[in-house]
Amino acid sequence: MADPVVRWRDDGTPFSPRFGDVYRSAGPAGALAQARQVFLHGCGLLPTPGQEAIWRGAPRWQVLEAGFGLGLNFLTTWHAWRQAAERPRQLFYTAVEAVPPEPDDLRRNAAAFPELAPLAESLIAPWHGLLPGVHRLRLDGGQVQLTLAIGDVQPMLAELTGEYDSIFLEGFEPACNPQMWRLHTLRAVARLARRGARLATRCVAHEVRERLVACGFEVEGTTAAGSPPALRARYAPRWTPRPRRSGDEAPMVAQPARCAVVGAGPEVLWLERAS
């Protein structure tokens, strides 16, 4: 019998048998605070004393996450967008995930965060039939669009087009998931970043920092002792990136090649769902 995507430990920690690492810490309060501190504050999406959130007044905002996991960063971002003053009219969130969790795992994880639980139920409603490939879930009346790229991180990133304003790198630790942190993967991330885009990650490994710099990111610092491990960077290449597709629309995937389907019958697989 195959291992489950998520194995729950006795202390409530969700664990990945495939990668041999935990999705988050055992304490719900700490996990939520870490998501906000590392990723939302790290990318300037929450206001601070004397500083507005950087997405305030923007017509749209595009977030790219490598490592969707159990959706905590997505739900936290969605919640922050809902609470934001002069929020962007549209939030596009694109996430790559090797193996999507089951709806029950999403629900069990979100149950630890009461303010996120209603959003999690809206996410779970269209969460079915997530075969390898790209799926778009329309949420909050279409104002929030979640694009899920299901598959290994590097080839999935290669399928995406567009320019992203915020980037979350949330894969498991390099020792557990080395593909996530290889140079060619980070180059694929850089290809999708607009100039000035902010990046945040919990990974502070020296070799990852060096690879980000090689890809055109300026590392702005890591958190001080006593704070959650985190790294912040800004995409500021010294070279001129190749022209790319405008970011005025929802993130897209590369145009597929033609194919023939034999014996499909009347069934049609819809990759875009609305809640």
Regions found by a protein language model. Give the residues of each.
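Rossmann-like AdoMet
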Residues: M1-W61, W78-E115
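Class I SAM-dependent methyltransferase core
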Residues: V63-E65, G69, A95, V261
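Glycine-rich SAM-binding Motif I of class I
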Residues: L70-L75, G265, L269
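S-adenosyl-L-methionine
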Residues: R107-L160
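Conserved beta-strand signature within the Rossmann-like core of class I S-adenosyl-L-methionine
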Residues: S166-F168, R195-C203
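A short glycine-rich, Lys/Arg-flanked "PGG" loop and its adjoining helix->strand segment in the class I
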Residues: M180-R195
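Class I S-adenosyl-L-methionine
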Residues: A205-A257
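N-terminal Rossmann-like FAD-binding beta1-loop-alpha1 element of flavoenzymes
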Residues: A257-S275
